[in-house]
Amino acid sequence: METSNGTETWYMSLHAVLKALNTTLHSHLLCRPGPGPGPDNQTEDRRASLPGRNDNSYMYILFVMFLFAVTVGSLILGYTRSRKVDKRSDPYHVYIKNRVSMI
């Protein structure tokens, strides 16, 4: 008699769930536009002509992304410029640089 480790039942249940999900996604029951009972069932033409609440949401997203890019860019630019500046009061420039050339 074979011993089962439980993966076969798990595989069968996963296969059944995925098959049901695939059937639901490919059915045309969810995406039928048309008049129906209730105020929520409007046709596509009428729904497209109504002003939506989130019509300009993409502009808000672009604005936030632009502000983030400016902030990060200014931080990177400020950091790299601060590292490039040669400070004359740096001990390397005061004591070591001139003496190395003498050796």
UniProtKB/Swiss-Prot annotation:
Glycosylated residues (UniProt): N5, N22, N41
Subcellular compartments: Cell membrane; Cytoplasm; Perikaryon; Cell projection, Dendrite
InterPro entries: K_chnl_KCNE, K_chnl_volt-dep_bsu_KCNE3
GO MF, one example: transmembrane transporter binding
Annotated transmembrane regions: 57-77
Annotated region described as Disordered, given as residue ranges: 30-52
Cytoplasmic side: 78-103
Keywords annotated in UniProt: Cell membrane, Cell projection, Cytoplasm, Glycoprotein, Ion transport, Membrane, Potassium, Potassium transport, Transmembrane, Transmembrane helix, Transport
Principal localisation: membrane
Protein's membrane topology: Single-pass type I membrane protein
Coiled coil found in the keyword field: no
Interaction with KCNQ1: region residues: 68-79
GO biological process: intracellular chloride ion homeostasis; negative regulation of delayed rectifier potassium channel activity; negative regulation of membrane repolarization during ventricular cardiac muscle cell action potential; negative regulation of potassium ion export across plasma membrane; potassium ion transmembrane transport; regulation of heart rate by cardiac conduction; sodium ion transport
GO CC entries: basolateral part of cell; cytoplasm; dendrite; membrane raft; neuronal cell body membrane; perikaryon; plasma membrane; vesicle
Family: Belongs to the potassium channel KCNE family.
Function: Ancillary protein that functions as a regulatory subunit of the voltage-gated potassium (Kv) channel complex composed of pore-forming and potassium-conducting alpha subunits and of regulatory beta subunits. KCNE3 beta subunit modulates the gating kinetics and enhances stability of the channel complex. Alters the gating of the delayed rectifier Kv channel containing KCNB1 alpha subunit. Associates with KCNC4/Kv3.4 alpha subunit to form the subthreshold Kv channel in skeletal muscle and to establish the resting membrane potential (RMP) in muscle cells.
Protein name from the UniProt record: Potassium voltage-gated channel subfamily E member 3
Gene responsible for this protein: Kcne3
